[in-house]
């Protein structure tokens, strides 16, 4: 399989001198095309910092990040903006939908910004909405949708441009268990049916158990990783065992 993401010896230090705090201490990892990978770790482990560096929201102190063979750490200005727009998709805990646009318009905006042919926009929006189970919400504004529908709309917006890599930061964090389950089910299907490559930060073992691989961070470094071999229930138990080693707590259970 083609390597979509390569992170090599990534370090991120905040502050200087005696006030310096190391958030990442030389993290190296890779993600292949079509993988669904989770990142877990206790508070302060560096998982959000890692995702932000890959997302080009934060700039690492040193190290290399390559997405689809493109080195990100040297990108600036228009080149960086274009890369984010065309090669990355983002799903955050806060949906960040535009209140004055319908669901259709929110999703279509991602394509319009990339200057996709106008004839393709409607069909691609409707296809992605159908895959995420929000085809009946396309004419609704965000305030007319449930939290789960809003988050699936945000996921459709992230996926509709067919990015190399989708970055998800606690996408189920603000959802109830039913809405979270629906979102995860749809993300799994997109991963399996379309080969979407997803890197997801989560604190929740149930959410992480939908991934095919989970990387655990502690104190800014990789502690261990697990690959899913059996069913989701078995993988969930394995994740819980590692979380217990890290001294964390698991809120959701199967």
Task: Please provide the spans of the model-predicted regions.
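Conserved beta-strand-loop-alpha-helix hinge in the C-terminal portion
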Residues: 221-245
């Amino acid at each position: 399989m083609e390597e979509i993401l390569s992170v090599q010896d990534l370090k991120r230090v905040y502050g200087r001198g005696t006030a310096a705090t190391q958030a990442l201490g030389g993290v190296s990892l890779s993600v292949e095309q079509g993988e669904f990978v989770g990142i877990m770790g206790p508070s302060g482990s560096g998982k959000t910092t890692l995702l932000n560096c890959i997302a080009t929201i934060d700039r690492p102190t040193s190290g290399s990040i390559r997405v689809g063979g493109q080195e990100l750490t040297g990108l600036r200005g228009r080149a960086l903006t274009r890369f984010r727009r065309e090669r990355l998709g983002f799903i955050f805990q806060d949906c960040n939908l535009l209140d004055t646009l319908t669901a259709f318009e929110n999703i279509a905006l991602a394509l319009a910004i990339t200057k996709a042919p106008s004839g393709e926009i409607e069909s691609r929006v409707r296809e992605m909405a159908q895959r995420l189970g929000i085809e009946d919400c396309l004419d609704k504004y965000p305030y007319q949708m449930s939290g789960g529908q809003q988050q699936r709309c945000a996921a459709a917006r992230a996926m509709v441009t067919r990015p190399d890599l989708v970055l998800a930061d606690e996408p189920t964090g603000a959802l109830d268990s039913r809405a979270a389950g629906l979102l995860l089910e749809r993300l799994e299907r997109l991963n399996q049916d379309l080969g979407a490559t997803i890197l997801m930060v989560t604190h929740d073992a149930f959410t992480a158990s939908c991934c095919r691989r989970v990387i655990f961070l502690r104190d800014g470094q990789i502690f261990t990783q697990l690959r899913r071999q059996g069913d989701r229930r078995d993988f969930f138990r394995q994740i819980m065992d590692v979380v217990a080693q890290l001294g964390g707590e698991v809120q959701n259970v199967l």
